[in-house]
Amino acid sequence: MTKLKVFLAVLLASLSLHIHPSEIDSLLRELDMSIRNRPQYTLKRQEQIDALQRKLRLSHSDQERYDLYRELFGKYRSYRMDSALWVANQRVELAKRMKNPLYVRSAELNIAEVMIGVAMYKEGLEILDGIKSADLDASGVSYYYYQYHQVYTLMADYAFSDQMKEHYRGLAYQYKDSIISMRRPGSQGYLLMMSEKLLYEEKYDEAIEILKSCYKTHEEKGYSVAIPSIGLANAYAFMGNTELQKKYLAISAIADIQAATKEYISLWKLANLLFQEGDIKRAYTYIECSMQDATFCN
């Protein structure tokens, strides 16, 4: 009986080793195909942008134009940063013409988002520091806190020293609680930020449980799974599980590519892992794709 148990344990371990790589191989092939099909995904997004621009040309009021520019900004963010900046500036001008301070601040936060997205952290912080949370509505305050969180997270990622990295990570952590307090408990935004907080606190199992729940919800509702997937990839990276890190980086990268997102991190992180494993050709393809999309995004 003992020998049978040992045999079954060895067999199951062997099977798991074969099942997991084949799953990753399948995901990588899907990612390869998605990269080849990038032009059609880009065309679809551009058609959505063109439709909004047609509505803008036919709009009859500043309020209608302001709302349409908000939608247009959403289409341009993570796609064409120079265009996103132009749209944000248009929103500022419209808001001033409408003499609506709340709208002005909202549009200025869009500009801060773009500055942060193109690594102009000083300029982004100057805009944020010039805005008071008391001058914003509830959704604006949440957005405001998130931009502070984002800039400090990115500054931590690219900090020169470990001391500076920890300093900026600490600043970003302070905003996690602020963001969580502004979001509806149980909502996807609430849960995703809670998972980030748990990762910072090294509570990896709890974070993974939340992220898997978010992943399932996003999948069921037809949302992009890019964000919960990159969260899971980060969690497994902290735990030293390279195989699951690769799996979720691949899933996140597929979602990004198919959504015609041009500003992303999953693909080049995956490329780095594959390069370390000796898959030089695929790593080169992924880095080349990332560079092309970064150039397109400006």
Give the positions of each predicted feature.
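A "functional boundary" signal
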Residues: 2, 7-10, 15-298
